[in-house]
């Protein structure tokens, strides 16, 4: 786990907002037709609509969060879905609690 890279990813307010929103996606993002948001994840277009930024900007932010392991990605047909990687987030919380 690259802590510096994770903290860099979290230093952007919008990326942090996306990660927080994915914790309770029903509350923070519009409903989507395909799949349960807790199982499959949230579609990029729903995240885009909830955040209010362009799809390319949101996709870039999600790619950064994925690169550092904070979100998981799942592709179903032409759609890409994201959800939090709770294992990484729990490990990060444990490291912060013990080492910082």
Locations of the language-model features?
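N-terminal leader segment of winged-helix/HTH proteins
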Residues: 1-21, 62, 67-70
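Gly/Ser/Thr-rich helix-start
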Residues: 61, 78
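Beta-hairpin "wing" of winged helix-turn-helix
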Residues: 67-76, 83
């Amino acid at each position: 786990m690259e802590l510096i890279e994770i903290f860099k990813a979290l230093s952007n307010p919008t990326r942090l907002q996306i990660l927080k929103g994915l914790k309770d996606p029903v509350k923070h993002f519009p409903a989507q037709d395909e799949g349960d948001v807790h199982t499959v994840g949230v579609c990029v277009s729903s995240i885009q609509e909830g955040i209010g930024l362009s799809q390319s900007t949101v996709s870039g932010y999600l790619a950064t969060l994925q690169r550092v392991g904070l979100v998981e990605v799942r592709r179903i047909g032409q759609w890409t879905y994201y959800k939090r990687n709770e294992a990484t987030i729990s490990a990060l919380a444990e490291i912060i609690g013990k080492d910082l």
